[in-house]
Amino acid sequence: YAEVPSPAAQAPTAD
């Protein structure tokens, strides 16, 4: 799904 970005990609990588 190119139109909808994955929520994981938007989340900041704290780890």
From Swiss-Prot:
Mod. after translation: O-linked glycan consists of a D-galactopyranosyl-backbone, 1-3 or 1-6 linked, substituted with L-arabinofuranosidase probably at the O-3 position.
Query: Record keywords: DNA-binding included?
Result: no
Whether RNA-binding counts among this entry's keywords is: no
This protein's source sits in the domain of life called: Eukaryota
Q: Tell me what this protein is called.
A: Arabinogalactan peptide
Please list the residues annotated as glycosylated. Answer: 5, 7, 12
Source organism lineage? Eukaryota, Viridiplantae, Streptophyta, Embryophyta, Tracheophyta
Q: Per the UniProt entry, what species is this protein from, by scientific name? A: Triticum aestivum (Wheat)
Q: Per UniProt, which keywords does this protein have?
A: Glycoprotein, Hydroxylation
In the record, which positions carry 4-hydroxyproline?
5, 7, 12
